[in-house]
Amino acid sequence: TTAEAVAAAARAAAAADAAVVVAGTTEESESEGRDRSTLALPGSQDALVRAVLGAQPHTVVCVNAGGPVELPWRGEAPALLLTWFGGQESGAGLADVLTGAAEPSGRLPTTWPASLEGTPVRETRPAGGRLVYEEGLHLGYRAWLRAGTEPAFWFGHGLGYTRWAYESMEAGPAGDGGAFTVRVRVRNTGERPGREVVQVYLERPDSALERPVRWLAGYAAVEAEPGAAVEAVVRVGTRAVEHWSVEERGWRREPGVFTVRAGRSAGDLRLTGTVETR
C-alpha cells in the first residue's frame, strides 16, 4: 500500500547518511495542451517527502516539474532543488549537482506561489470562449508586487554553493535614447567558486502613467573565486524605460528619474540608485 511504501522510505532514510527524494509532476497532471486544476503534487508525494524529512535531517528534495507546484513542506527541507524536466542526461547532471561537481546556478523564470489560493490572478478565468487579461501590465511577479503579498519564491530566485555580498552600484548616465549601463560590484563571501546572476530592476513611483511597481530591466552573470570581487555590467536598453502609447500606437518615453535597484530576485534587492532620462 501507499502507507507501507512511505514507511519503508522513511526507514531507509533513517538508516542512511543522507537522503534524496525526487518528487514532481507527470504527463497525467501537467501538459502544454491543458490547464491544471491544482498546483498540488499528485498522489501522496507530500506525505512521502514529509516522512523522509522527519526521518533524516540531511535530506535533499528534488522537484521534477515543468512549472510552479505547491511545496507545503519547503520550510522543513534543508535543501530544495528544482530539476525541471531533463533530457536523457538528466540523471548524470543531477548527480553532478548533488555531489558538488557542478553548481546549481539557475534562476526561476516564474514566481512560485505558496498555494493556489494565494495567487493574485486566481480569479482570471475565460468566459464564453474569451479570456480578458484584466491584470494588464501586472503579470507574473508584478502581480505579487501590486498586491503586496509574498510568494513562496520570487521570480529570479536561486541559490548555489556559495554566498554573495552586494557592495556597490553605479547607474547611468542615460544617453539620448534613454539607454544606460549599470555596474554592480559583488563579492563571493563563501568558500567555493560560484556564479551569480545580478538582476537590475526599474521603478517609477512618481509616474503619471500606470506602471508596474518594478520591472526587470536587465541582468548579467558573473563568476568569482572565494573572497574575490567582480563587476557585473548590465546594459539597460531603451525599451526598458519606454511605455506603449495606445493613443499614439508606438513606444514613448516619459522623461524623469527612474529608481534603479540591483539584487538577486524581484523580491531580494540589495542596492538602490537613480538615473534620469530625457
For the regions a language model picked out, list residue spans one by one.
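C-terminal non-catalytic regions of proteins with extracellular/luminal or membrane-system context
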Residues: 1-278
